[in-house]
Swiss-Prot record:
Domain (Helicase C-terminal) ranges: 714-879
PANTHER family, alphabetized: ATP-DEPENDENT HELICASE IRC3-RELATED (PTHR47396:SF1), TYPE I RESTRICTION ENZYME ECOKI R PROTEIN (PTHR47396)
Source taxonomy: Bacteria, Pseudomonadati, Pseudomonadota, Gammaproteobacteria, Enterobacterales
Miscellaneous comment: Type I restriction and modification enzymes are complex, multifunctional systems which require ATP, S-adenosyl methionine and magnesium as cofactors and, in addition to their endonucleolytic and methylase activities, are potent DNA-dependent ATPases.
Family statement drawn from the similarity comment of this UniProt entry: Belongs to the HsdR family.
Coiled-coil zones: 143-229
Gene behind this protein: hsdR
Motif DEAH box: chain residues: 574-577
Processing and modification events after translation: Upon purification after overexpression about one-third has the initiating methionine removed.
Known catalytic reactions: Endonucleolytic cleavage of DNA to give random double-stranded fragments with terminal 5'-phosphates, ATP is simultaneously hydrolyzed
Protein name listed in UniProt: Type I restriction enzyme EcoKI endonuclease subunit
DNA-binding interval(s): 431-450
GO BP: DNA restriction-modification system
Amino acid sequence: MMNKSNFEFLKGVNDFTYAIACAAENNYPDDPNTTLIKMRMFGEATAKHLGLLLNIPPCENQHDLLRELGKIAFVDDNILSVFHKLRRIGNQAVHEYHNDLNDAQMCLRLGFRLAVWYYRLVTKDYDFPVPVFVLPERGENLYHQEVLTLKQQLEQQVREKAQTQAEVEAQQQKLVALNGYIAILEGKQQETEAQTQARLAALEAQLAEKNAELAKQTEQERKAYHKEITDQAIKRTLNLSEEESRFLIDAQLRKAGWQADSKTLRFSKGARPEPGVNKAIAEWPTGKDETGNQGFADYVLFVGLKPIAVVEAKRNNIDVPARLNESYRYSKCFDNGFLRETLLEHYSPDEVHEAVPEYETSWQDTSGKQRFKIPFCYSTNGREYRATMKTKSGIWYRDVRDTRNMSKALPEWHRPEELLEMLGSEPQKQNQWFADNPGMSELGLRYYQEDAVRAVEKAIVKGQQEILLAMATGTGKTRTAIAMMFRLIQSQRFKRILFLVDRRSLGEQALGAFEDTRINGDTFNSIFDIKGLTDKFPEDSTKIHVATVQSLVKRTLQSDEPMPVARYDCIVVDEAHRGYILDKEQTEGELQFRSQLDYVSAYRRILDHFDAVKIALTATPALHTVQIFGEPVYRYTYRTAVIDGFLIDQDPPIQIITRNAQEGVYLSKGEQVERISPQGEVINDTLEDDQDFEVADFNRGLVIPAFNRAVCNELTNYLDPTGSQKTLVFCVTNAHADMVVEELRAAFKKKYPQLEHDAIIKITGDADKDARKVQTMITRFNKERLPNIVVTVDLLTTGVDIPSICNIVFLRKVRSRILYEQMKGRATRLCPEVNKTSFKIFDCVDIYSTLESVDTMRPVVVRPKVELQTLVNEITDSETYKITEADGRSFAEHSHEQLVAKLQRIIGLATFNRDRSETIDKQVRRLDELCQDAAGVNFNGFASRLREKGPHWSAEVFNKLPGFIARLEKLKTDINNLNDAPIFLDIDDEVVSVKSLYGDYDTPQDFLEAFDSLVQRSPNAQPALQAVINRPRDLTRKGLVELQEWFDRQHFEESSLRKAWKETRNEDIAARLIGHIRRAAVGDALKPFEERVDHALTRIKGENDWSSEQLSWLDRLAQALKEKVVLDDDVFKTGNFHRRGGKAMLQRTFDDNLDTLLGKFSDYIWDELA
């Protein structure tokens, strides 16, 4: 029998948490609800005091405080799990009158473990033996005497007279605390408001007292205290028992809708399946295995009477997926006969037969020798899912019905209804639907969009879980996604699809496309009841849900409301190159001493949460995107789209060069300059060194208004802000964009006196604080006459479709090929309404000289910003010396190396800047003194000395330097503020050169000669090139695309050839690439391709007495040739040809002579008489 509190050891250490724990015990088992409420209070009080000890700033609520604790590397996952369990179940008790006795017992046990951990931490009694936990048996008021004692102390305090003001305040604090304790101990029901206030006041009083104690210590003493707390906390875990680990797993299962209690819901204690009840029954006996031994499944999950899953759950599961083998054994050895006999003792034969038929369903394993009896197998150790150590955490499961199904890690359990739905699905049958329904005519797709959808379907049928689709910007990725989702839902292969975007504007654009798209007369929205950005959770009937990453982070990662892992079974990721970043794998040392939140992107955590097939859409698949999703299952390139006539080509870039951009700007040491602070203030400065600025530095480190003015004046010769062709200008910063807007308005106002103010505006993320208003501005740019010229930084770099953009101006240096391609993609769309036949790029910052080539892209990795204090903590922690990294050095040595490098950079910057700023100089002098005292060198030699002496010596030095890191952080801030202020230079500038860029060639004549030379010396380089030169009728569309891409790689684009010919011969001839090849190879005259087609058509019409129907089709064929250049079977599968019956119908129209007719067209087009 329990004769004293399990939490007795807290008495005198933290009387407040002790009193709360006593009250929780006092109400067990008579009032589980109050026990749960008190244990929630216990968790809050413990966390709040822990936050105080660890210098965590005050948080608004317990959830935020725990998130901050989670960022501290030493706080073990299990500790956070216990805090969260106490909080969540306590919230249920407060708000829903949750009154579960088992939960109350679990919270007492877990709170006890937490109390032991806390006690060891704050008392430094690290070897404190864990007392035996005794569960309170009945509601004896064990604390009656304690309440009486407290009341006597209260009366005595009231009678005592305080003399000084300090004594008065101390007495008041004591009275508040005593009243709080009494209110807590006497509370048998939910607290009244007065009791709540007393509790909070008591807590605040005690924390204030603790804070006052800390404040009396010196800074060095406080630092030493915090260090010791941290050091020891790293070593301490909760050391949960098997039973307590099961408590956590039980809670996870209950969160997912299962009845779970490892103590009472056990087979040995009579727990049996029940109709209409979803149970996780522990220690269920299985049949004998191959060795003849009978086993016991840790859990069998029953939906009603039906066993649906088996679970291997062990505290010491290190590699969780490896223990799935145990779960497989449970499934293979599961004895359905025994289950039927057990159920027949309680239920009718009909009920039993329906749930467990005598003819049992089973599934063959990979060996072919054994069969699985239970379809879903799980393994877990109760540890929260961590992407950076996936195999040692989370809930691993596998659907064993198909040998091709792989095991997966999940952060939550499947819900019962989700498993039933999965069990009822028939993937093979649903996959067959795609083969049985290949037609997509009702979807109105282009041929390549159909090919893309088929490629995705083929990958799904093969069992691929991550799928990448690469389609050039402007080729209808959203339309393709709509068609793909339509068919995926129609096939019933997927029940609910998440369309995930990383910005609200992209989501609204997608929703608009869904509303505009009609299938068989109905809008896509109306067919599937699509839920949008404002819908928090989709209803069961919802088939498609559009959401931003940010909203799902709040709903999934920062909410107590559970997000089922099977809420979506397919996720379509739009613009996948943007937010979806490859996560950095942590080293052993980083795993132990640094927070995983630094390493895992929110995007990745969201996608990892759901048990779903992920389909990513992008125009520019970077290396990191491919590493995540695999190679694209289908590609449709920009060049192919141009050849197909679905996108327009670009003219050769127009380079605008000013005198300062060409010569650079050189400033000498000692020169007086003005800097502009972020607040717009002018700061006088003297240069300490020579500085040489190139055009890439313009409007970053150097602001020359005359440069922007000269460029804007030159643009007036090419752009018309009163017309319908629109322009997008990319700037460096928001401040730069503001300057450019004013310069453009001033320049164009001179040429167009009637220019309206809104013809030229800025649209950036901070153009308006309301995101909806920014979206409205983008919509105006797209659909209204004004604005005509928009200046931006990076808001419109990707995903926004505005077909009327005909000009792209780069006033910002871009080195990333992916970003450049995305920016350029804003202008590639067709827009005949504004007479758009090509688009122009204006390069004002020499962008092509430094643009990265595609094959030099490197993975984009989340590289956490490691703070100086973190590195210092790591070298002063003895445990970091015991962790060996891959190169054989300790984690402390790695941290020391990073620390020295960071210090060296700060020292270098400080030395350079100290004469420029009196504030910095003063700080460096103080640092000189501190370093001299602690390390025997001045600040300038500090990093070198640390490197020389090593991490142990460095750790001792930093222990002598309290507040040193704070000083360094202040110094860094002041240096950055000084250096970030760009130099303002009021000098003249003028445009000295405007020319079209032809790759490596200075003149269009050189460009054409190089093209001719390439053709003449490489006739065998491409099979299609041979066909063009020797037998054009053999050229296929596939060959034409490959040929076009081959010339593109040599930087001989068709549009550049046309422009170069025009500049050298003063003739604008649309001869197409084939015309230029034949001119260079066989000397054909350069004539417009359309003229050649018309000549061939006239000749063919004169050869026969064609019917009116045949003449109409001849005209259509000629028009198709003008657009496509080459006609082959694929052309007849799309558009008007397809709608009118395809190639078969044309064969009948031309008496089975269609191929001969097409051959004549090809011959006559290139006839020497043409």
